[in-house]
Every structure is written in structure tokens, then in C-alpha cells.
Amino acid sequence: MEKNKRAIGFLLLVVLINGVMMTRSNGYEGEEEWGGAGGGEWGGAEGGGAWGGGGGGGGAWGGEGEGGGEWGGGGEGGGGGRRGWFMMRESRQVIKSEGGEMRVVLSPRGRIIEKPMHIGFLTMEPKTLFVPQYLDSSLLIFIRQGEATLGVICKDEFGERKLKAGDIYWIPAGSVFYLHNTGLGQRLHVICSIDPTQSLGFETFQPFYIGGGPSSVLAGFDPHTLTSAFNVSLPELQQMMMSQFRGPIVYVTEGPQPQPQSTVWTQFLGLRGEEKHKQLKKLLETKQGSPQDQQYSSGWSWRNIVRSILDLTEEKNKGSGSSECEDSYNIYDKKDKPSFDNKYGWSIALDYDDYKPLKHSGIGVYLVNLTAGAMMAPHMNPTATEYGIVLAGSGEIQVVFPNGTSAMNTRVSVGDVFWIPRYFAFCQIASRTGPFEFVGFTTSAHKNRPQFLVGSNSLLRTLNLTSLSIAFGVDEETMRRFIEAQREAVILPTPAAAPPHVGEMVSDRFV
């Protein structure tokens, strides 16, 4: 008898330890794991900032810390809910310069993360340039606000694309690109997914700058090597390499604090037509290389990369507007034919049939807008993990563990980032105070077929009624009335379930 008790006790101890280890490895350590620091304008933790964050201070775009901020958030002074296990709160400020900044919200970690994904927030002041560079990670960018010109090398050719709000563009790892904010007097806000699977192992991603800003990757080569490679004199090389050290985001025209010299890249963007072409020839005086040198065998020849970016040859100059580069795709253009819509809201899902580069990225994109008090019905994604960013309004995210217990019931507001593991049931509910809009990325570029657990198109209506009634322990008529009571599908009217709840109405008016 005593042996049996000890055996049972030992077994219970093993189960308990295993449960704790699984919880930790799955990334459910709770708020301590996610608590980044620093703040900044676009998300983060302590200090808040315009795009909100975790710690004290909040900020205009919501946050988790004390004070809440203009757009609310969790923690003291801003709503909250249960522990935000599926909120992405750990962030790093990777760029800070006179012309803008970039903050990266780090991917969650654990065994249930099938494909890690960081979320980046880039802010650029008017008339600024994100200097030419390439990354060790792929980017899928979404223009949240503003207009820009993207210069990128793809399929061994240089092309420029005009981007506006709603545009999506994929930049593969290793592709040289730059971004120029062309919006008149308007900040450029970009949200991007960052795929670290090809990275060198850095915490966020590693940029390699071609020219200007921080030290160019070219600056590490011996000067005599570069003068030979570029076929220029040493003074000309020094002019290229030492023109500016103002960070990776610089003003095209002189910024708030005038500098002795503007960059070659700034001068380049400020010129037009033939004047630009002549000035570039004067600066670099690059000669035609051998036929072998002109081939972009893998896109990594420094001479050809720079020539391609600057568009020095007549042939490239003529073809830059119609290169092999893919066009962007504007997700707002699909609002006329959304994936689903009713009077309670609409949703748009993009896969590789809509935008071919998504097939190479392995990432899908979605955009959801819920009217005040509406709910995206409880459902699960059988093919992908979902990452979401709140664009407008506020609401609740509810996630359920496989064992049927609540995993998260958290208030979210603008700038918050959340993730939903594959197969986990969840729903989103808009606040009664206004519409709730969020954009996001999925870990599959195939057509997403969410399985709804509630509504007129739910799985319960598809299953055998007799089996269902036995499973729930009720008679068939009761079961039928239960599953047929909701006549709407996908997006449901749920004012009673929507925040703010009783007792929160007064305080939430000021969130």
C-alpha cells in the first residue's frame, strides 16, 4: 500500500514537472518574458512613445504600462485583462537617427512557434532617405501611411516602385534596396514582417549598408582595393566614403541641424533627369567593365551593385522604370471585393494567387475591420500561425488553450502586436466605442481556410447532429436549436460581449 502511494506521488510529481517545463518551453512564461525596454515612437516597453509599448508612460499609440497613454492599453490606467501570453511586447530600437527610427518587436519563442517572425515599425520624417543596404532577413513591407519611392535590385536589375498607403512589397534577403519618403510634409509609417530564418543569428536582423549613414560595408576594404574595383582615384573614393555620418535615415535636403556636407545619395535624389545622369558620371566616372564583369552572377559584385543602383549606363537608365522587379500590391484595392463582408465588418486575405512574391516569402497577409461591438467569430487556423497589429480602435483578443481553459483575454489598442498559434481557437471583439481594424501576417502563403466554431457556417452545423448531441449530453432538438440560433456568419453582432464592460464606461472615454 505504501509503495503504491509513493508510486502515485512520484507519478504526480513527474506530471507536474513536465507541465511546468512545457509551459516554459512554449513561451508561456508570462509578462516577464515579453517585457522589452526603451519605448520609442513605434511600440516597445518602458517609455511608451507614439506607437505605444509596455512599461511606464504609455504613449499616443497605446501601451501596457502605467498611465495608459492617449490610446489606452493594458496595465494600470489602461484596461488590461488576463496575462498577455500571446501579446508580443519585447522590442528593440534598431535604428535611431535624425531622419527617423525603426523598432522591432521580437518574435515569441518556444516549441509551438513553427515559423518565427519579427514585426518591424519604421518611421521616416518628410524628405528623408533610408540609405542603400541589404539585410540578412527578408522583409514584407506594408505602407501604413505616406508615400515613398522604393529602389531595389531584383533579378539582376535595378527598378524603382512608387508606393502609397496600403501597398505591400516583398524584399528578399540579400537584395539591395533604399526607401525615399516622397510624401509632401508627411511622415512615412511602414509596418513589416521580418523573416529571420535566413539570418546570421542576430537578435533582430543585420543590415549591411552600401553607402552613407553608418559605416558602409565597403569601408572595411583596403582603399587601394576599392580604387581598383571602382576604377576611381583615391580622392573620389574618399568623397564617396566620408560624405556623411548622420545615421541610416538622412534628410534629402538639409535637416533641422545643417551639416557641412550632404551625402552623395542625398544629392542624387535631389537631381532630375539628364542633370542627375551627368552628375553621377562626374562623381564616379565608372568605365564599362568586361562582359564577364557586367554579369550579375549572384548579385554581389560591388561594382555592378553600385552601377545598378545609380543607373549609370544608358541601357539601365532606359529600363529602370520597367525592370524585372515585381509591382507592389495594394491591399485596399481589394476592399471592393473582400474575402468576406457583411454589415458588421469585412476581412481581406491575400495569398500567392493575389501577389506572386508571397509564394517565395511563404507569408500571407490579412486586413480586418470590425464595426463597433462586432466580433470575428471564434475560429482556428489549421494551416498557419497568425501575427496581428492593431491599426485603429480598440478591442479584446481572446485565446483558448487546447484543454478548453482561457489562455488570454486581453484588451488591445493601436500599435499592440499579438500572435495566435496554429490550431488555437480565438476571437477578436471590437469595442463599442468605435471600429476596430488590424492588419497581420500569416506563416503560409496558401489560401487560408479558417475553421469557424460558431455561426451559420460553423463546424458544428457540418457535423452529424446525433453525434453532437451525444457529445454534449443533450437531446437532438436542444442541440439543433443551440447551433442554429446564430444566423450570421464569420463577423457577428455582439454588443453585450464587447468592451468597455459595465463599470468601465466612464474611464474608457478618456482612454
Swiss-Prot record:
<feature type="glycosylation site" description="N-linked (GlcNAc...) asparagine">
    <location>
        <position position="369"/>
    </location>
</feature>
<feature type="glycosylation site" description="N-linked (GlcNAc...) asparagine">
    <location>
        <position position="231"/>
    </location>
</feature>
<comment type="function">
    <text>Seed storage protein.</text>
</comment>
<dbReference type="GO" id="GO:0009506">
    <property type="term" value="C:plasmodesma"/>
</dbReference>
<feature type="domain" description="Cupin type-1 2">
    <location>
        <begin position="329"/>
        <end position="480"/>
    </location>
</feature>
<comment type="similarity">
    <text>Belongs to the 7S seed storage protein family.</text>
</comment>
<protein>
    <recommendedName>
        <fullName>Vicilin-like seed storage protein At2g28490</fullName>
    </recommendedName>
</protein>
<feature type="glycosylation site" description="N-linked (GlcNAc...) asparagine">
    <location>
        <position position="464"/>
    </location>
</feature>
<dbReference type="Pfam" id="PF00190">
    <property type="entry name" value="Cupin_1"/>
</dbReference>
<keyword id="KW-0325">Glycoprotein</keyword>
<feature type="domain" description="Cupin type-1 1">
    <location>
        <begin position="86"/>
        <end position="238"/>
    </location>
</feature>
<feature type="region of interest" description="Disordered">
    <location>
        <begin position="54"/>
        <end position="81"/>
    </location>
</feature>
<dbReference type="InterPro" id="IPR014710">
    <property type="entry name" value="RmlC-like_jellyroll"/>
</dbReference>
<dbReference type="InterPro" id="IPR006045">
    <property type="entry name" value="Cupin_1"/>
</dbReference>
<feature type="glycosylation site" description="N-linked (GlcNAc...) asparagine">
    <location>
        <position position="403"/>
    </location>
</feature>
<feature type="signal peptide">
    <location>
        <begin position="1"/>
        <end position="27"/>
    </location>
</feature>
<dbReference type="InterPro" id="IPR050253">
    <property type="entry name" value="Seed_Storage-Functional"/>
</dbReference>
<dbReference type="InterPro" id="IPR011051">
    <property type="entry name" value="RmlC_Cupin_sf"/>
</dbReference>
<keyword id="KW-0732">Signal</keyword>
